[in-house]
Amino acid sequence: YFGAAANEEREADWPEMKFFSSMDSPYPVAVNYRLLLPKILGDEVQKILYLDGDIICRGSIAELWQADLGSLLAAGVPDPLEAMHRRRLPEVKRYVNSGVLLMNLQLWRQENILGRAMECYQTMKDFGYPDQDVINRVCNGRIGLLPQSWNYPVSCNFAVQGRRNDIVPEARLCHFLGPVTKPWYVTCLDPRAQLWRSFRERSFWRDQPMSGAGSELEAEMRQIVRMFEDGQEAP
């Protein structure tokens, strides 16, 4: 839906796109597109399941889709680093990972969540994870909690963590977390990356070369630096 040319066209009509594009942030503007979903989609779309691009679906999501949000603005799975995030944002009751969000678009429109998110960006000084921090702050107290099977964390930075969690059978949505060693990098040596690669072999993009991201050691060193910057304790 979004591309470079499309972004320029929408910036002329949408002040929200211009706002997000003008932000001084190390993160790509695309991380904020989920906030625009109530505006992108017509009013007839009252609910949507948002998934990050680094997620693999391993079973039916009908049960998740049929969940009744009621007066909740969204539902998500607690972030693996929730304790660390709540130290930064003590006012947030629960902190969910924004990679899987069941969103109540009807209420997002009625309560102007997009506008409130933009205001939050203007007033917050410390952003660990911009869109995720904003969603958890603006929707504070009205985010339902989902079982971990709906956003099962898979970190390929196993040399940094010193441990590896096996992908359990009940995991429906597997999320390859972390900013560096992704399964589509040729330097990713984690055996669990084979799950993602097995799906790739069945896709239209199977003949496209995978990305190079420097050595795995370099990627893991960058992750260590980020852990200290975020105040995360070394494992």
Language-model regions: role of each:
Residues 11, 30-81, 93-95, 102-106:
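GT-A fold catalytic core of metal-dependent nucleotide-sugar glycosyltransferases
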Residues 98, 103-235:
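A glycosyltransferase accessory/donor-loop signature
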